[in-house]
């Protein structure tokens, strides 16, 4: 069995599943496996009762696992984001592809920049009483949910306080 990088009880981020708790490592042979192998057993926070098995020998899938940020790590990310902006991609198809690729990478810095970009666009549309296109709104909500879930655990604050923390940390800039 490979030495695990993550230990039972540790919170990790796993791709689109967001925050998961490492339930342990289990040696097992699934129907499509030629032989038994070691799997990380993950419990997604957003889907109680679900279990995810990540083969420890699959570098691509294990590469999608990363430890939850701590407060110092989050503050470092916020410092790098402060004062930066992402330009609004005007082409709807290109924007959809770019934003979805960005969400798939789960890079907090990129996600915060994307949120700021979407928020700025939403504010600019409110004056002529227009709204964000549905796909942009959906991406915004997905991004907010993922970041709130992670940052709430990292900061040990209720999810509803994350927005205010980010707003203050970015000197009043909407994140």
Which functions belong to the PLM regions below?
Residues 1-5:
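Short, surface-exposed secondary-structure edge patches
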Residues 20-22:
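Conserved hydrophobic positions within beta-strands
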Residues 41-57:
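A short macromolecule-binding patch
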């Amino acid at each position: 069995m490979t030495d695990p990088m993550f230990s039972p009880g540790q919170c990790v981020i796993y791709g689109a599943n967001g925050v998961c708790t490492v339930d342990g490592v289990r040696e097992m042979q699934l129907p499509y496996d030629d032989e038994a192998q070691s799997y990380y057993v993950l419990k997604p926070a957003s889907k109680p009762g679900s279990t995810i098995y990540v083969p420890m020998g699959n570098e691509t899938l294990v590469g999608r696992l990363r430890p939850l940020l701590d407060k110092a790590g989050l503050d470092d990310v916020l410092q790098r984001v402060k004062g930066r902006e992402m330009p609004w991609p005007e082409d709807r198809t290109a924007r959809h592809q770019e934003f979805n690729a960005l969400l798939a990478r789960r890079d907090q810095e990129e996600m915060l920049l994307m949120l700021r970009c979407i928020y700025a666009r939403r504010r600019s549309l409110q004056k002529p009483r227009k709204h964000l296109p549905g796909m942009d709104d959906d991406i915004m909500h997905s991004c907010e949910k993922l970041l709130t879930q992670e940052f709430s655990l990292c900061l040990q604050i209720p999810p509803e306080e994350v927005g205010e923390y980010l707003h203050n940390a970015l000197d009043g800039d909407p994140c």
